[in-house]
Each structure stands twice: as structure tokens, then as C-alpha cells.
From Swiss-Prot:
Domain of life of the organism encoding this protein: Eukaryota
Protein name per the record: Putative gustatory receptor 10b
The keyword Oxidoreductase is assigned to this record: no
MF terms in GO: ligand-gated monoatomic ion channel activity
Extracellular side, ranges: 30-82, 154-170, 252-273, 372-373
Role: Probable gustatory receptor which mediates acceptance or avoidance behavior, depending on its substrates.
Chain segments annotated as transmembrane: 9-29, 83-103, 133-153, 171-191, 231-251, 274-294, 351-371
Compartment annotation: Cell membrane
Bilayer topology: Multi-pass membrane protein
Length: 373
């Protein structure tokens, strides 16, 4: 399966990249077929984190003078939006560091556990097409963070691109990759959970012991799923808030470039700047929708009930066990643990609510920005 091979290559490349960038102290061991802890990687990891947090002050000083005076009609308002964006990046960096310190080992252990269930218990041969396409889409969005062409050409025609511009953009790219690396790990765990639940539901069982084994495995997977949601809950919440704000600022920036087409900002490369702004906006919206689709797929697999084996359907003990499993599933489905921060009992309306929120705030911020001072 060509898409499956491409998915495996993307996974290996992503795992290698996060090691180079210092986002993980675990590496994949092909011999043991699991993630393995390394003290050397942990030292390298924490060194880069300290440097990253220490460099924030220089980035903040640069960001305060990023937009030149007279570049926008409402320069003061633009500077306020820019300042909020910078401090939200700091919040994301601190949250990511905190979660990295608390949960990295648990996340890697969970990944190893799911991989073991898929390979040994469920005899996985090839991932489903949905798994491959969803993961490739997420990895594409992750690599899109390398693109800082818009900020690089923002001053085109006003001043030359210098070393500080390059360093500041690399810092922004690094923090964007750090944020999305954790989100990719979250999506990867959700996809593995969905695959495990799907394959477990397809297992054939002709005896009572087979049914019991299937039900116990299912309950184990559901417990893993609740644990994953709890570990990533705050990061996902903060990341979604940041992305809505960033898209709002992107709308404002695009509108400004459009409305000031005869001003200094529009003298050079206006069409290219507008195109890059639209691409940035759409990629973020697609990333949010992708998360919703994956969560919806996982919930669909969780809500399926294992079939009772036909040849022992008359067995009172077997039928009662199946009935109790269905009852436990109904209780768990409405449990607060499945509703962490209100984000994990999702349907597609939630995705479009986020999109609508981003567009609405974009319109409001444009109106505020152009109120005569």
C-alpha cells in the first residue's frame, strides 16, 4: 500500500526531526520496536528549552519594533495585537515545557503500550486508509510551520531583510514546531487508539473466553483513551485559543494589506503577501477541522458495542456479560472523564463553530482597528 509506506516514512522523519530539535528525550529503537529513554537526549532537550525561554526577551524586544512606524493606519492598535501574540507564544512555550516535564515519559509509555496491543494482540498488518491520510495531513500542517515567507517579505519595499529578522523568524518557527510537535503526538495517539478499537471490534469470537478477552481489551483501550485526553487537555485548550487569536490577527493583516493597496505597504509584492496570508489562514483552519474529524472518528469507534457470539447467544452467562458491557459503555459515554474541558465529545458542528468564531473575531477586530482616533 503506497500511502501506508509514505505514512511510515513520514512518521520516521517526524520522530527524527523532533530529536534534532530537542523536543523528546526518547528515541525509537528498531531492535526493541519501542520508544526508549536516553539521558543524553534529555540533557540536550533541557538545554535547548532553557536557551529557548532565555531568548524570549530578545524576541520580545525585536517584536516591539517589527512593524515600522507609519506602516499601518492604526499603528497603535496593530502593536497591541502584536504584543498579545508575543505573550501568547510565551504562554504556549511555558505550557509545553511544563507538560514535557510532567507527561513525556507517560506519553511514550502509552505509545509503546498501544503499539504492543496493535502488533501482538490484534496482529495489525496495515493501517487503515483513514489513519494514513489523517496522519499525513497532520504532518503536512506540522511542516508548514517552516514557512516564514510572509514575515520575511512583510517589509519588502520599506527596509532590507537583516540578520535580526532571520533570527527572530527562526525563533518563531522553532516555537511553532514545538507547539505542533506535541499536537502531532496527541493526534498520533488518538489515531492508534482508533485503530486498536476498530481492529478489536472486528475480532471473531466463538467462545465465551474469546468474548471476555475482547471485552477486557476494549475496557483497557477506553481507559488509555481517557488517560490520553487528561494528559493533553490543557495544551489543546491553550493551543486552540492561540490559533483562533492568530487567525484573527491574520484576517486583520490581510484586510489591512487589501485596504492599503495604494499605501506604502502595497507598493511591493501585494499579491504575494495576500496569497501567503490566505494560505496561512486556511492551513490553521484545516488543522482545527482535522483534529475534530479525528476525535469524531475515535468517538464513533468508542461507541460501538461488541457483538454477542451467535453460537453461544443462548448461554445466559455470556449474554449477561455482553449486556453488562453494553451498560458500562453507556454509563462511561456520559461520564465527565469523556468530556475533558468540553472538547472531547465532539461533532462536526464544533469544528465549524471554531471557524465561525475566528471569522467573527476577525471582523470585530477589523472594525475596532479602523474606528477613527
Amino acid at each position: 500500500m503506497r500511502v501506508g509506506k509514505l505514512c511510515r516514512l513520514a512518521l520516521r522523519f517526524w520522530m527524527g526531526l523532533i530529536l534534532v530539535l530537542g523536543f523528546s528525550s526518547h528515541y525509537y529503537n528498531p531492535t526493541r520496536r519501542r520508544l526508549v529513554y536516553s539521558r543524553i537526549l534529555q540533557t540536550y532537550d533541557w538545554l535547548l528549552m532553557v536557551i529557548n525561554l532565555g531568548a524570549f526577551y530578545l524576541y520580545y524586544r525585536y517584536a516591539m519594533t517589527y512593524f515600522l512606524e507609519g506602516m499601518f493606519r492604526r499603528q497603535g492598535f496593530v502593536n497591541q495585537v502584536s504584543t498579545c501574540n508575543v505573550f501568547q507564544q510565551l504562554l504556549m512555550a511555558v505550557t509545553g515545557t511544563w507538560l514535557h516535564f510532567l507527561f513525556e515519559r507517560h506519553v511514550c509509555q502509552t505509545y509503546n503500550e498501544l503499539s504492543r496491543i496493535l502488533k501482538h494482540d490484534l496482529k495489525l498488518k496495515e493501517h487503515s486508509r483513514f489513519y494514513c491520510l489523517a496522519f499525513l495531513a497532520k504532518v503536512y500542517n506540522f511542516f508548514h510551520n517552516f514557512n516564514f515567507a510572509l514575515s520575511a517579505i512583510m517589509h519588502w519595499g520599506l527596509r532590507p531583510f537583516n540578520v535580526w529578522d532571520l533570527l527572530a523568524n527562526l525563533y518563531f518557527v522553532y516555537n511553532s514546531l514545538a507547539r505542533d510537535a506535541i499536537l502531532v503526538a496527541y493526534v498520533l495517539l488518538l489515531l492508534n487508539l482508533s485503530e486498536a478499537l476498530r481492529l478489536n471490534g472486528q475480532q471473531e469470537h466463538d467462545t465465551y473466553s474469546d468474548l471476555m478477552k475482547q471485552l477486557r481489551r476494549r475496557e483497557r483501550l477506553l481507559r488509555i483513551g481517557r488517560r490520553v485526553h487528561r494528559m493533553f487537555a490543557w495544551l489543546v485548550a491553550i493551543a486552540l485559543i492561540y490559533l483562533v487569536f492568530f487567525n484573527t490577527a491574520t484576517i486583520y493583516l490581510g484586510y489591512t494589506m487589501f485596504i492599503q493597496k495604494h499605501d506604502a505597504l502595497g507598493l511591493r509584492g501585494r499579491g504575494l503577501k495576500m496569497l501567503l496570508t490566505v494560505v496561512s489562514f486556511l492551513v490553521i483552519l484545516w488543522d482545527v477541522v482535522l483534529l475534530q474529524v479525528i476525535c469524531e472518528k475515535l468517538l464513533a469507534e468508542e461507541n460501538k458495542i461488541c457483538d454477542c457470539p451467535e453460537d453461544v447467544a443462548s448461554s445466559r452467562t455470556t449474554y449477561r456479560q455482553w449486556e453488562m458491557s453494553a451498560l458500562r459503555r453507556a454509563i462511561t459515554r456520559s461520564s465527565p472523564e469523556n468530556n475533558v474541558l468540553g472538547m472531547f465529545r465532539m461533532d462536526m458542528r464544533c469544528a465549524f463553530a471554531l471557524i465561525s468564531c475566528s471569522l467573527s473575531y476577525g471582523i470585530i477586530i477589523i472594525q475596532i482597528g479602523y474606528i477613527p482616533g
